[in-house]
């Protein structure tokens, strides 16, 4: 099991073209964040902070119920930490998703459901704003946004709250029998 360490550090690899996490002991983790997705501070070495470790733990706890192997859960949690800290600010792309209601605002780390006419998927809330949230896709099967665009495991998208529903509501809604 992967345990955060104060010896870890983030850096951008010109040869890989991606943000990397040095885990020590000659172990490296390549994130899914390429140069064009990163804020300026990602291009210098940055320590893995206490906040990063706290976020990693939060994401690990929330994704524990997902049908992923332990290495994939750790990978997703690290993708989430990297995106929350180093992803450039983006505008919502809510038009890819169906409206699911109003009044719902997720909390950081919470699993949410997004759907469209092609599929539905489970995402994890990374950065919650007043009206929209940056979230990461959590399935190994591609999520079709439209006929030509997809989201892959760990990729992020910002979406308005009216497109989201709570995964726990979907998974754990008790069945009720009508009796007379």
Curated annotation (Swiss-Prot):
Role according to the record: Contributes to the efficiency of the cell division process by stabilizing the polymeric form of the cell division protein FtsZ. Acts by promoting interactions between FtsZ protofilaments and suppressing the GTPase activity of FtsZ.
Family statement drawn from the similarity comment of this UniProt entry: Belongs to the ZapC family.
Subcellular location: Cytoplasm
KW Cytoplasm (keyword) present: yes
Protein name: Cell division protein ZapC
Family annotation (InterPro entries): ZapC (IPR009809), ZapC_C (IPR048372), ZapC_N (IPR048373)
Keywords attached to this entry: Cell cycle, Cell division, Cytoplasm, Septation
GO cellular component, one term: cytoplasm
């Amino acid at each position: 099991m992967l345990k955060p360490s104060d010896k870890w550090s983030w850096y951008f690899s010109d040869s890989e073209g991606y943000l990397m996490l040095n885990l020590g002991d000659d172990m490296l983790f390549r994130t899914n964040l390429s140069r064009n997705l990163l804020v300026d501070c990602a291009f210098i070495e940055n320590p893995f902070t206490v906040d990063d470790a706290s976020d990693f733990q939060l994401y690990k706890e929330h994704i524990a119920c997902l049908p992923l192997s332990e290495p994939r859960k750790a990978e997703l949690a690290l993708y989430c930490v990297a995106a929350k800290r180093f992803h450039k600010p983006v505008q919502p792309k809510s038009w890819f998703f169906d409206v699911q209601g109003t009044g719902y605002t997720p909390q950081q780390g919470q699993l949410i459901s997004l759907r469209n006419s092609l599929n539905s998927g489970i995402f994890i809330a990374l950065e919650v704003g007043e009206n929209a949230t940056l979230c990461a896709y959590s399935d190994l099967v591609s999520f079709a946004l439209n006929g030509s665009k997809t989201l892959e495991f760990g990729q992020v998208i910002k979406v308005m709250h009216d497109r989201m529903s709570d995964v726990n509501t979907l998974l754990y809604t008790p069945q009720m029998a009508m009796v007379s």
